[in-house]
Amino acid sequence: MAQEVFQRTKPHVNIGTIGHVDHGKTTLTAAITMTLAVNSTCTPKKYDEIDAAPEERARGITINTAHVEYETASRHYAHVDCPGHADYIKNMITGAAQMDGAILVVSAADGPMPQTKEHILLAKQVGVPSIVVFLNKEDQVDDEEILQLVDLEVRESLINYEFPGDKVPVVAGSALMALQALTEKPNTLRGENKWVDKIYELMDAVDSYIPTPKRDIEKPFLMPIEDVFSIQGRGTVATGRIERGILKLGDIVELIGLNEKIRSTVVTGLEMFRRLLEQGFAGENIGVLLRGIEKKDIERGMVIAQPGTIEPHTRFEAQVYILRKEEGGRHSPFFAGYRPQFFVRTADVTGVIEAFEYDNGDKTRMVMPGDRVKMIVNLICPIAIEKKMRFAIREGGRTIGAGVVLQILDSTQLKSKNK
């Protein structure tokens, strides 16, 4: 059967459900797809279809994630739901499904729980820009005051982790009651059932409060170099996939990483699948011919970027998940001073792990497989890194961890330019 062509008629937003185990994340995901299926071509998903999540691999780590899609009147959404708590942590740190926004599900009967707060913190660390709250299980709460207390408590938790808790939309409802109504009458329309209406109200809040993300094409140009070769009589060609932005013939670009010099050069040729291009766009695999650059000046792991938009650094703080033995990770702990390989974009660089600490600020000398820690890393040579970047940690050919850069620590702007 021929594959259907994806018609992009509405802005696309990636979203996910976060929150404590058993507060109703997967039930809500099912209720949203069934509610919105009435007005769109997207397929409704039952709870057990979402809960039997397929395995994904991101940066060498297996993650159980379920992806569903749905549409509102104004947007197309891709929604990720992870059944297990560990899967959430791995998904958010590896960026297997990067979220433009999240729906935080909190049981109105229980209020915020430890995992609720952990997910809010993690959302902040990995750069989820906006959160909308769904107070689930409203049908189990008889007292309006309890609902108001939980609302207040959730807002305080969000403020504690630097989200604008006083402005965040909070919608109370019952995913299970909505799901039951939709199971009995699949084409329930707005205004026909109070619980289904709450799902519409939630999606109205998501539509209006979570901003449409800036598309990669609008960002400054950057391409990690995958391979380099010489064309006799023409010069040096670097190949790779454009991560963001647009590259045009005649553009001035910088070569950054693996040494302290930032070289400046001009793009004299662009090609894709052996066809000449006037310009290359984010997501495309291209070859770039660079003026006055010899093969020895450029290698895999460097990036080609719009001048002044990214710099080489060696030292950074990161949030890292260390794989358990069962996930193919280490069998034993490691200590400060450990020197694994860091895979950042196409670069593969040795780094020294100088220090660790847990989210509560407790320092530790030893990290166990399965831990999630902050660490300070010092690479042996500078590479183009920036906040929110993802990376893998490897040792002896296997992935032992995955991380996201929280902040750059070295202040040395390695800008001895050689133009």
Curated annotation (Swiss-Prot):
Chain intervals for the UniProt region annotation (G1): 19-26
Chain positions covered by the region annotation G3: 81-84
Pfam families reported in the protein's UniProt record: GTP_EFTU, GTP_EFTU_D2, GTP_EFTU_D3
Region spans: G5: 174-176
Enzyme's top EC category: hydrolase
Cellular component GO terms, alphabetical: chloroplast; mitochondrion
Residue segments, region G2: 60-64
The entry's keywords: Chloroplast, Elongation factor, GTP-binding, Hydrolase, Magnesium, Metal-binding, Nucleotide-binding, Plastid, Protein biosynthesis
Region listing for G4, in residue ranges: 136-139
InterPro entries: EF-Tu_GTP-bd, EF-Tu_GTPase, EFTu-like_2, EFTU_2, G_TR_CS, P-loop_NTPase, Small_GTP-bd, T_Tr_GTP-bd_dom
Described purpose of this protein according to its UniProt entry: GTP hydrolase that promotes the GTP-dependent binding of aminoacyl-tRNA to the A-site of ribosomes during protein biosynthesis.
Name recorded for this polypeptide: Elongation factor Tu, chloroplastic
Annotated organism of origin: Chara vulgaris
